[in-house]
Amino acid sequence: MNTKQEVEKFLEDIKVRISTGVSNLLFLNGREKNAQALLDLDITPNMRVEIILSLKAEDFYRTEDGKYRDQYEMHSFGKLVKNNEVYIKISKTENGIICISFHISEFPIKYSFK
């Protein structure tokens, strides 16, 4: 995704798919820092979903160089949650939406459209 319009379209698509139940939103909680983020931020899993549903094009960081499972693009965002910048990486597959990363950012995020 290179343009703000492409990011807006991606976000609209995943939001519709999640909110209508067409696609499940799967979190990779097996990754320690993703699970730890819920504790560090003092948020519930449902709050995490709401944060993803609130993403805007202005929160877009970049499209990652690699691919999830060698075939699906990964898109990264940042969001301020309880005064912490949270790094969020999402991939859209034909079967669902995968949140690969959701944790406090380890580096400053340079937003593409802010």
State where each predicted segment sits.
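Charged, low-complexity, helix/coiled-coil-prone segments
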Residues: 31-33, 84, 109
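Functional cores of ribonucleases/endoribonucleases
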Residues: 53-96
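Enriched for short, Lys/Arg-rich terminal
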Residues: 91-114
